[in-house]
Amino acid sequence: KRASGPAQINIPRDFWTQVIDIELPKIVEFERPSGGKDALQHAADLLSEAKFPVILNGAGVVLSTGIPASAALAERLDAPVCCGYQHNDAFPGSHPLFAGPLGYNGSKAGMELISKADVVLALGTRLNPFSTLPGYGIDYWPKDAKIIQVDINADRIGLTKDVTVGIVGDAKKVAEELLSSLSDHAGEANRADRKAMIAKTKSAWAQELTSMDHEDDDPGTTWNERARSDKPDHMSPRMAWRAIQAAMPNNAIISSDIGNNCAIGNAYPSFEEGRKYLAPGLFGPCGYGFPAIAGAKIAQPNVPVIGFAGDGAFGISMNEMTAVGRGEWPAITMVIFRNYQWGAEKRNTHYGLQITLLELS
């Protein structure tokens, strides 16, 4: 078993026209590293002395089954836990220390809390740009904080942000090692004030998010305002996400596609366990949502699944329609945001009010 990533299988053409014998190679298990001794101790010392530690969980926490380990570390420190863009399943949503996702259309609570950090533990994340870019007018990345970055891939450490300590290792193992290496007084500095601030900040953001019905127009544009005036009885994407979130089963698996309609949803779904949020990430493959959720249902036929896509992205996935229509395939739920346009491209491609080739019939 190797690190998670895409795989390609090449099958010679003549193999499809005959019965063949194959021998499957034996699975080789690799022991994942838990980090270097000196780096771990340096990181543990920084966390032990931190006055406002913050943990940022990435996909590595999910892939390493490290969510319980990161929770134990967070609880020892009473550190708020954020997650990377579209990795909302990297920490239990009901946990009082969970501050939500960073990045595009993420959690303002998470952004405000990490901006106060003096030490950030970036656990199992490459710190990709979409997970650290400003949001809601807040340039929140704590430029003066000590950054501890943990990644199984050494090439990613320090790639996008300056780091104080880099640890090459499995996120779960590193979290466990750090917890066992903390000093007796770790987390004690400002603990009560920090816990109160986390609760207050989360509550304020939850109320604000509930009241956000529409997207604001970019300076110089009026797309959203005109869309609301044209169809005042239609739900906005934010209204739809709120309604879906309220009705969604707690154990559901969801998939997302690219585009603004789905990206708006970064602030809404939360999960109690990992491998519940399938998202295209920075690769940005248009048409990802439908086939991803179909695959999830085949793998987990007894778990409810919900896919999300805009009408443009969904239109790219018509091959999958022939597959899911087969009687032996389990049923899936697919939510289509219908705005009859390539909305993200239309929003960013204009001269005055003239738009070309971005409408869908």
Feature map (PLM): residue ranges:
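Short, solvent-exposed amphipathic alpha-helical segments in soluble enzyme
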Residues: 1, 24-26, 65-78, 135-140, ...
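Conformationally flexible catalytic loops at phosphate/diphosphate-handling active centers
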Residues: 1-49, 210-227
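Glycine-rich beta-alpha junction loops
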Residues: 11-16, 59-61, 87, 154, ...
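Anionic-ligand anchoring segments at beta-strand to alpha-helix junctions in alpha/beta enzyme folds, i.e.
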Residues: 35, 42, 48-120, 246-291
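Glycine-rich, acidic loop regions that bind phosphate or pyrophosphate groups
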Residues: 87-206, 327
